[in-house]
Each structure stands twice: as C-alpha cells, then as structure tokens.
Amino acid sequence: MSSDSVVAGNISRADVERVVRAVLTRQLAGATTSSGSVSSAGGPPNPLVVNISARHVHLTEEHVEVLFGKGVKLEPMKWLYQDGYYAAKQTVTIFGPRRRMIPDVRVLGPCRNASQVELAFTDGISLGIDLPVRISGDHHDTVGCVLVGPAGVVELKSGVIRAMRHVHMSPADCAYYGVKNGDEMDLKIHSGPCTTTLEHVTVREDKDVKLEVHIDTDEGNAVDLSHATKVELVKPVGCGCHSK
C-alpha cells in the first residue's frame, strides 16, 4: 500500500482535518475557483484575487424607485468579494442608440450618487456604442443609454463606460508593492500556453478593501482566466532609455 493511502476504516477526524488543510494550502498557492476568479497567496499582506466583472449597472436611490417602484430598495442576491457590496436581485434592460438591447443586466449595490453602466467592448458593439475606457465614477465625455425596469424608464445622459482594469489595494498592500493610488501595474496570468500580461492596471487605494483585481469579460476570456493556475501583480520597470 502506498504511504499516501488511508484505510477508510481507520481514518480519524484528525486525519480528515490534516488532509483538508493540506489541500486548501495547495489551492491557495494558485487555484481557479468555480466562479472563474483566481487567487494567489504567498508574500503580500493579503492574498491576490482576480475577478471578472461582468456587465452591470449602478443606480441612485431615485433611479431605483423609478425603475422598480416607489419605496423599493435593492435586495441583495449574492454578496461580492469586497465587504458590503452585492449583486442585487433586480435587473434592467439596456437600450442603445440603435434600439438594440441587452436584457437582464444585473444591478449592483449599494446605491451610488450617480447611476453608471459598465459594459465590455463586445457589449458596446452589440448596442452600437463606442465605449470610452474610464475609471468608475469618471463620466466625462461619456454617452448615455436607456434603462428599462418593471416599473419605469430612465434615460441616462452619460455614464456608460468600459471600466478600466484596476486593482483594489489597502495601504498595507500599496506599501508591499511600492505603489500609490493612481499608479499602474502589470498583471501576469499563468494559464498554460495562454500565459499573458495585462498592462495598465490602475491602483485604487482604500483602507477598507481587500486586494482584488477587476477585469471585464472580454479580458477574462482573452487570458483564459478560468484555467489560470497563478496570478502575479508586478510593478512596471522603465526601459531606461532616458537614464544617464
């Protein structure tokens, strides 16, 4: 019998706990979860997690009532990785300028001060919208769309964006990587023959966040994130062309 084998009749609770701990430790060293996200541990103060941010909508309280009815509040359906944030039960239909639509787009909570629609590049093609790449909240020179809910319609004049890929970092994470809010990093995704580096990952620093990278569905598919075995954040190094 192999030294790695365990006889079922003699296994104890301690043996089970030891095996489970060993498996979890190996998985945290770089494993893909069922949700398509990837985590990588070892080194930084917090484990690095990369998640795909699918198309979604952020709404003001006023727009929630217009779309879903007076007095209606967003109802959490699934809690997200960042504490306090969730995918709501409510969804809307998005109409673009060519009267093309995308139905059942999830609303994320909690509510914001300004409504915003975040789409992938291919979503923009479907709707006939030339999506500008923006950090969340930057609606300068952005287009609008029409949101339709079960109780009403909201016409947004602006706020439809393709979210710039970014990483949420705490002050401790920033100190570890030697970066600050607004800096850019590189994300290396090891995924078999499809190992890829995504540049220009913008740092978003906040004291109350977990270390997490957000990329959109197009980017996640391009790097084959669902099969990734390891992810790394790297501070870009200049080429030295202008150094003395």
UniProtKB/Swiss-Prot annotation:
Its cofactor is Zn(2+). One of its GO terms (cellular component) is bacterial microcompartment. Belongs to the PduL family. Zn(2+) 1 binds at residues 56, 58, 118. Signal peptide: none annotated. Its EC number is 2.3.1.222. Zn(2+) 2 binds at residues 166, 168, 214. It comes from Planctopirus limnophila (strain ATCC 43296 / DSM 3776 / IFAM 1008 / Mu 290) (Planctomyces limnophilus). There are 2 Zn(2+) ions per monomer; Zn(2+) and CoA bind inbetween the 2 domains in each monomer. Phosphate binds at residue 112. One of its GO terms (molecular function) is acyltransferase activity, transferring groups other than amino-acyl groups. This is Phosphate propanoyltransferase. NCBIfam families: PRK15070.1 (NF011652).
